[in-house]
Amino acid sequence: MSFRTQPPAPARLNRCQLFGPGSRPAIFEKMAQSAADVINLDLEDSVAPDDKPQARRNIIEASHNIDWGNKYLSVRINGLDTPFWYRDVVELLEDGSERIDQIMIPKVGCAADVYAVDALVTAIEAAKGRKKRISLEVIIESAAGIAHVEEIAAASPRLQAMSLGAADFAASMGMATTGIGGTQENYYMLHAGVKHWSDPWHWAQAAIVAACRTHGILPVDGPFGDFSDDEGFRAQALRSATLGMVGKWAIHPKQVALANEVFTPSDAAVAEAREILAAMEKAKAEGAGATVYKGRLVDIASIRQAEVIVRQAEMAKV
């Protein structure tokens, strides 16, 4: 193991990030009452250009007037390649309430993108005397973003989370698909006349998880576009959780329960993790570094694996 200790990710639930357009204030109350851990009010793709100033005002007003409870309140600003982003940051932090927790930066391609937002946020916080330190989440949505993923993950101490934006990522990569997440029809191997589908997002997700875990950031899976396909959403979420991601976006309210289900350890998983920890405690007391649990080897690494599940359960109060 390296002498450099791997920093822990923020100790907060991020199982589901529910998105809603800033141009639709009528849904804000319902979002606040949802079971999502994170609320993402959007100023970017879901808001038409002419509606962006009003959407900004809607979010600012909602930050003052809506009871967001224990939700982590995040706002996705416009991309740094647009004329809207700086005004998003300035108005949100000068006029918005202290209830805003996070700014989400889309289409991040390099560390300099994060530096730019961080510098502006820092200046406004100082000028306005804001008490709460704003955190950042970035979205990897391009070939450049995935190529520079580790430097992006290390770009700012404000950075708490990183998501994969599948649709724009696919477009940037030139992928032959119009799907948003999930299995793609033509991405398969053929063996003995039988198709075996693979996951075209796997390598990008794995790169994001590795960069995030190296720098103490929460890795999050992005959207699943077909909100009529519950099993497809669940399958994608299960793959992401197995890789080490902590949560997933919901672009429809019905996806919130699915995400929470997948990213909350089951009672059986928690019970097994606790049994492994107990078995290893017994082994250590007997001077052994490993033992057998249900017919399989468990050792010091198994302790770390089990502790991940137990920590997740404790945060979710399972």
Swiss-Prot record:
Q: How is its activity regulated?
A: In vitro inhibited by EDTA.
Q: Name one GO molecular function term.
A: L-erythro-3-methylmalyl-CoA lyase activity
Keywords tagged on the record: Lyase, Magnesium, Manganese, Metal-binding
Q: What is its EC number?
A: 4.1.3.24
Co-factor: note: Divalent cations such as magnesium or manganese.
Under InterPro entries, the record lists:
Aldolase/citrate-lyase_domain (IPR005000), Citrate_lyase_beta/mcl1/mcl2 (IPR011206), Pyrv/PenolPyrv_kinase-like_dom (IPR015813), Pyrv_kinase-like_dom_sf (IPR040442)
The residues that hold substrate are 19, 24, 30, 76, 167-168, 251-252
Binding locations of Mg(2+): 141, 168
- Keyword field contains Cell membrane: no
Q: In its UniProt record, which GO terms are filed under biological process?
A: oxaloacetate metabolic process
SUPFAM superfamilies per the record? Phosphoenolpyruvate/pyruvate domain (SSF51621)
Database matches in Pfam families: HpcH_HpaI (PF03328)
Which reactions is this enzyme annotated as catalysing? Answer: (S)-malyl-CoA = glyoxylate + acetyl-CoA; (2R,3S)-beta-methylmalyl-CoA = propanoyl-CoA + glyoxylate
**Cofactor(s) needed:** Mg(2+); Mn(2+)
Assembly state and interactors? Homohexamer. Dimer of trimers.
Q: What family is this protein classified in?
A: Belongs to the HpcH/HpaI aldolase family.
Q: Explain the purpose of this protein.
A: Involved in the ethylmalonyl-CoA pathway for acetate assimilation. Catalyzes the reversible condensation of glyoxylate and acetyl-CoA to L-malyl-CoA and the reversible condensation of glyoxylate and propionyl-CoA to beta-methylmalyl-CoA.
Protein name per its UniProtKB record: L-malyl-CoA/beta-methylmalyl-CoA lyase
In its UniProt entry, the species of origin is given as Rhodobacter capsulatus (Rhodopseudomonas capsulata)
